[in-house]
Amino acid sequence: MKISIFFAFLGAAVALPVNDDDKIVGGYTCPKHLVPYQVSLHDGISHQCGGSLISDQWVLSAAHCYKRKLQVRLGEHNIHVLEGGEQFIDAEKIIRHPEYNKDTLDNDIMLIKLKSPAVLNSQVSTVSLPRSCASTDAQCLVSGWGNTVSIGGKYPALLQCLEAPVLSASSCKKSYPGQITSNMFCLGFLEGGKDSCDGDSGGPVVCNGEIQGIVSWGSVCAMRGKPGVYTKVCNYLSWIQETMANN
């Protein structure tokens, strides 16, 4: 059994152990600045992953998106052009969860401290951490600049959105026998056709105004019976708060 993670580098895909389902397939172009907490993680060459602004100086993302140097781009809609109001801030600290497992993607969560605080406005704002875990069938919003097709590559300039429900723990485990830990949940449509995928990794799953998930991994994007798998943010509230307080 092998899962694969796919990172896009200038149009080329590099397969690594573990599969990252980090794009939006079957979604729609988000209305401009509908998702003001969404950030793009840039490696100096291109967009690599998504993330979420949770305070004026901290971003939440996936641990498998880690790079030694990252620039956080806020207030973006079209990531290929400057539209006005964007803020580009280098990362000061990039902190992966100490128990992150790159083989199983358990604890796939990371915090990024910005070198300077973001200026909060209508284009750049924070998303709330959850007060409790999301319930089955909760409707959530997933967003990102990832691949928009299941086969091949078609990466959008404009931020894409997808509304999808949280699936039951039993159906999630049935879709991925032996691979789902208590720190993961599935979201999407078992019939396929709509999903997150390559390029959306690290991005937000927001339910009722709270960030409940981080785009983590999956099988072939939008494949029947293989929904996207997300990091369960509600399990990490203490770690998030302690890490921010200590850094």
Curated annotation (Swiss-Prot):
Active site: H64, D108, S201
Disulfide bonds: C30-C161, C49-C65, C133-C234, C140-C207, C172-C186, C197-C221
Any one of the GO CC terms: extracellular space
Cofactor(s) it depends on: Ca(2+)
Cofactor note: Binds 1 Ca(2+) ion per subunit.
Domain Peptidase S1 positions: 24-245
UniProt-listed Pfam families: Trypsin
EC number: 3.4.21.4
Gene Ontology MF terms: metal ion binding; serine-type endopeptidase activity
Keywords: Autocatalytic cleavage, Calcium, Digestion, Disulfide bond, Hydrolase, Metal-binding, Protease, Secreted, Serine protease, Signal, Zymogen
Annotated compartments: Secreted, Extracellular space
Cleaved signal peptide residues: 1-15
Catalytic activity: Preferential cleavage: Arg-|-Xaa, Lys-|-Xaa
Site keyed Cleavage: positions: L82, E83, K194, D195
InterPro entries cross-referenced by the UniProt entry: Peptidase_S1_PA, Peptidase_S1_PA_chymotrypsin, Peptidase_S1A, Serine_Proteases_S1, Trypsin_dom, TRYPSIN_HIS, TRYPSIN_SER
Family statement drawn from the similarity comment of this UniProt entry: Belongs to the peptidase S1 family.
Name of this protein: Trypsin-4
Natural source organism: Rattus norvegicus (Rat)
Gene that encodes the chain: Try4
